[in-house]
Amino acid sequence: DPARGAYLRWMFFAAGPLEAAMVNEALGLRSDDERAPSILGYGTVEQVIDTLEGALDGVEYIVGDRFSAADVYLGSHVIWHLAQGTLPERPTFRAYADRLMARPAAIKAAQIDDELLKAHPFPGMEEMGS
């Protein structure tokens, strides 16, 4: 499959640079040290975010025009980090997240999650407004 390279690239991008950059961002571990790009292993947070935005700009899915497991994995990162505020709210990221969440399987999964949470609430859920 000619898309295999892109598929593998984005699976590993999500697991490596994206996750590391977002966790460091969440923990406030940003460095102004000029050596940061080589020490951190992914460049800068801005480079990671810009790389992802460039890849998603103008495409429906990360491997082009068809949905793949790479979208499930990368999309879960995008959706989670948008919700947490660690990934900046940019139109490209929001459009991608919205496309993924509008898929029939995502809608069904969310309904199942909601039903399970109602049947098995966890302590403190009421205080969270859920």
Question: Which ranges hold each PLM region?
Answer:
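A short, structured active-site edge motif that brings together acidic residues
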Residues: 1-3
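GST-like fold's C-terminal all-alpha helical module
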Residues: 10-102
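Short, flexible coil/linker elements and helix-boundary hinge sites characteristic
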Residues: 28, 41, 111, 120-121
